[in-house]
Amino acid sequence: MTRGKFFIFLIFSLALLLTGFALLYRYTQTHEVIAFWGPEGSQSISSPDHLELWQLVPWTDQSADLPQGSTIPIQDRQYIATKKKDVTKAPGFINASGALILNRNYNWSPRAEESDCTPAWTHALLYRRGAHTTVVAISLNCGWVYSRKANRVAGINKSVTEGLARLFQEQLGS
């Protein structure tokens, strides 16, 4: 084998090795997130066409009908949006969305560690991509997120929780 062919073979081998490493690295960074939000949900979070921030309160008026388009079911309870804001282009939400699709930012069994925390589901991020909508319900007091797809909660780390709280304060004043 001539020297030129050897270097071409070496470059292609290195490229294949690095491609395999990149795929393995990406898998380890996102596989639990994809199971939690679902493939379409993870895609919606990572690159949404539209992003809305909702401030939520529990729906307590059982005698009246739920308003259409302003409610979210979270853990067998209905929540209603008291404020809505389009934050698609708002500063900070691209980074927040990026944080929500990385495994390292989650605690996958928060109830075992913080069993005394009662979540107050006060905010939700609605990610829309095409016809698909992913709802990320957030309890800032417990540092938890809720997935309707998985019908379970997961903890988010303290820095992500604090960052989301700052963003919500800036956008909604709450």
Give residue ranges: language-model regions.
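Function-determining sites in protein domains
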Residues: R3-S13, T19-S174
